[in-house]
């Protein structure tokens, strides 16, 4: 299964993604309400392990990742970072991990809850991306991948959607 998290409009999704989507894909996109930010309450770890306690339609994002082989994120660049919508959803994926810490590559990281190893592709888009923004986005993507227990990550940058958005086949 692929988890595809994006902040595209309905029109952009239809024009650039529709022909590449599979029936088995789990699409995480904007709903009528924006996702609420993670409260850091530990509820997804101790009250409802693997599921966020905030019931707003985005509570299962960590569990979706636990059943996925691929995680594709399409985000507008916002000052060298994920867009606010994407950032909130990524933060809510913390239930993908256990609350316990392990050392990986000399750094402290959460222990993985699931045994899968994600293949991650991040596609940032935006007009006039600066070198500084690209450096920040590259570092942020790699750090996120390490936190999710993988080093299998590809990061791409699009100045426009001409030529389309290429997902893995």
Language-model-detected regions and their locations in the chain:
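Glycine-rich phosphate/pyrophosphate-binding loop and the adjoining helix
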Residues: 128-169
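Glycine-rich anion-binding loop/nest that anchors nucleotide
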Residues: 73-74, 97-105, 121-126
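Short, conserved loop/helix-junction motifs that constitute active-site signature segments
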Residues: 111-119
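Short, acidic/small-residue loops that bind anionic groups at enzyme active sites
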Residues: 93-108, 149-155
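A generic local structural motif
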Residues: 57-60, 106-110
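N-terminal beta1-alpha1-beta2 submodule of the flavodoxin-like/Rossmannoid cofactor-binding fold
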Residues: 1-71, 75-98, 146, 157, ...
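Short histidine/acidic/glycine/proline-rich micro-motifs that form metal-
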Residues: 77-79, 126-131
């Amino acid at each position: 299964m692929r988890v595809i998290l994006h902040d595209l409009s309905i029109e952009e999704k239809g024009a650039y993604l529709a022909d590449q989507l599979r029936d088995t894909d789990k699409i995480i996109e904007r709903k009528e309400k924006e996702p609420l930010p993670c409260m850091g309450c530990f509820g997804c770890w101790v009250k409802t392990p693997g599921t966020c306690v905030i019931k707003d339609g985005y509570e299962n994002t960590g569990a979706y990742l636990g059943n996925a082989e691929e995680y594709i994120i399409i985000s507008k660049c916002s000052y060298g970072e994920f867009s606010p919508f994407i950032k909130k959803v990524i933060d809510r994926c913390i239930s993908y991990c256990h609350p316990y810490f392990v050392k990986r590559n000399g750094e402290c990281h959460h222990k993985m809850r699931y045994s899968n190893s994600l293949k991650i592709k991040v596609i940032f888009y935006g007009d006039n991306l600066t070198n500084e923004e690209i450096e920040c986005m590259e570092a942020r993507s790699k750090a996120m991948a390490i936190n999710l227990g993988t080093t299998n990550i590809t990061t791409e940058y699009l100045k426009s959607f001409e030529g389309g958005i290429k997902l893995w086949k």
